[in-house]
Amino acid sequence: GAWQVKKQYTQVGSYLQVPDPENRLCIDGSFSMFAYIWPSLHPKVGAQAVCGRYDDFNNIGYAFGIDETGHLGFIVADGKEFDAVLSEIPLQRHIWYFIGASYDASTGRATLHQMGVVNRYNSLWGKVTPMDYDSHVSETLRFKPKHAPDISFLVGGTWDFHANRGKFVNELYSGKVDRPGVVSRALSREEFDHICSGGKPPKNDILAYWDTSVGYTDTGIGDTVTDTGPHGLHAIGVNKPVRAQTGWNWNGRNDCFRLAPEEYGGIEFHDDAIIDCGWDVTHRLTIPDNLKSGVYAIRLRAGEGTGLGEEYIVFFIRAKTPRAPIALLIPTASYLAYANDHLTFDAQMAQPIVGQTPIVSDIDIEVYQSPEFGLSTYDHHRDGAGVCYSSYRRPIVSLHPKYRNPMNGVTWQFPADLSIVAWLEHCNYDYEVLTDEDLHREGVDSITPYKCVITGTHPEYYSETMLDATEDFVVGGGRLIYMGGNGYYWNVDFCEDEPWCMEVRKLDSGMRAWNAKPGEHYMQTTGQKGGLWKNLGRPPQKALGVGFISQGFESCRPFRRMPDSWHRTVSWITEGIEGEIIGDFGLAHGGAGGIEMDRYDLEKGTPPHARIIASSGGHTDNYMLVCEEVLYAFPGMTGTYDHRIRADMVYFTSSNNGAVFSTGSIAFGQALPCHNFDNNVSKLLANLVDAFSKDGSLPGGAWISDEKQWR
């Protein structure tokens, strides 16, 4: 049917908002304000509001701001016009400053202080750089500030208004803020110096003091910033300002907030962050109780219903009571990591890494030009910082079933996983679906009812809970078919209060789009160290038998059966397949082996009794060894030279009749539909699913003792 829709607006940018029902921060007399700041955006991009209670549309209130020339200002306005005290020296990017301003109501005198607080670790430049950071300016203002009672104090922006969208936050700040505060009198230079050096503001005069280092626990910190002053004016994060970030006094000795929370007062803001569009509900759909578990989409059409006029809202129906023997585990965490990525446009490596010219569509351009769509964890914020949060509360075009990755011209993530869904449907298997969020929330209990769990083509992002559950499932007798490449790679977690939001910290190793800054390697949401599971003692080889070795994107190759495949414990896997070649076809560049690939590696934890069923080979030099495998770089680490660059199909058994089969290749699943599903890749997978989904012992179990002598 037809739905009536309306234009809705999205608040972009992260900031803190301070509920102040008694208007404690509508100050009639003298006052002072202060903060430590670390600006990160080039000043010439436009004005930024650091903190204050200011309405830019109505010219009323007070605030710290940065003008278009990069100069700090203390601004007051009376409802008609504004006046300001400006620093003499522009702020520099990635430098820590203490800023303070006082206003004496009896004289109208305002004083602005700007002082660099650079140590050997905390800023872009060190002590040897002879830069003058300090400025102290005092002027008599033309009028005293007035206040609008219907606005709140903000950190990271200022209030604005538009006739169509109403009130919103504008002049968004990019950078860190640490321990801002407001006191009820004009402080002296000596008192500001005391706070600048790490002292507390005068206790009896505090109106609000947001101690950004308060609230850390072993499991992270939330979005609420504690006001330790007498009025409890706690600040609420909007669009997830990033916490667990180093503050002005970080001295380089501690790399985690658990060790020195007082050095982690930095809260980082980005003017293009988006976590929740905050839209009103347009339409509600009630899912029938008898709807089968599976993958569904609502198709929306506007106008002619083509191109940008067509959209799909994808959703997954989980069984209320699991009954099927097979579960398809939808890798929604990885979908979230790649959601609306801008790599084609912004990444200099995009074209050489895929070995071809990207081809963009109208929707790619639309997403790139519209900040309301948000960013992926492969992108950078406008100030150059890596994006560590991704959320489902926004439109995600890469979840469109018809979407093609513009970089490599093939399906990717969800659209690629539809090949597995199509195969299950074509073969009439009795299966149900669940998502990464289900696995993360409920652990092993979510998959224990199933005999066989099948993953998607690229389950790259995995939380500790998910990894624990997967291992416990196999140890308990479950059978796992890992259908992808480069899986179980990055450690992630979901925000407890915002389960639609995921965090990742990309560190000093791994194929990555950005590096977390020094000292900022631990996640706000859990307190866990981010980065590769390999570097946390849990390489994917330990759970899957294979781990990431190479990526190429421009071509794929077939698999060739290995000697292990003829052993009587595993020969059933290739039963009915003629010859040695498997998968010399596929929707992903004509082969089942490629895109991103994993290999068998005993030194990284592949179980010693694991069998290599088949391996790809003959990859091009566009396939390079992943960087975490490289200690010294030298020629020859590419597909035509390095024997390690291959995809390995690996099988091994576990306790209680459990087992794992890994394809080692993203392209494997996209070979299934070829020749109307009548092909040797499909046959191999059918052999596995048939065996894995039945009660009793696995085929070849009668000779399982042979494994002790086989290698």
What are these regions (language model features)?
Residues 57, 160-161, 217, 332-336, ...:
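Solvent-exposed loop/turn segments at secondary-structure junctions
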Residues 498-687, 691-692:
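Glycine-rich, aromatic-lined ligand/substrate-binding cores of catalytic
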Residues 294-300:
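Short, aromatic- and glycine-rich surface loops/edge beta-strands on solvent-exposed regions
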Residues 1-243:
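Extracellular glycan-associated modules
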Residues 22, 164-168, 271, 275-291:
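Signal that preferentially marks extracellular ectodomain short beta-strand elements
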Residues 240-275, 302-446, 696-697, 702-710:
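Aromatic-Pro/Gly-enriched surface loop or interdomain linker
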Residues 272-273, 284-286, 290-292, 409-496, ...:
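Helical hinge/lid and interdomain linker segments adjacent to catalytic or ligand-binding clefts
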Residues 75, 208-211, 326-330, 432-435, ...:
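Structural recognition of the beta-strand scaffold that forms the well-ordered cores
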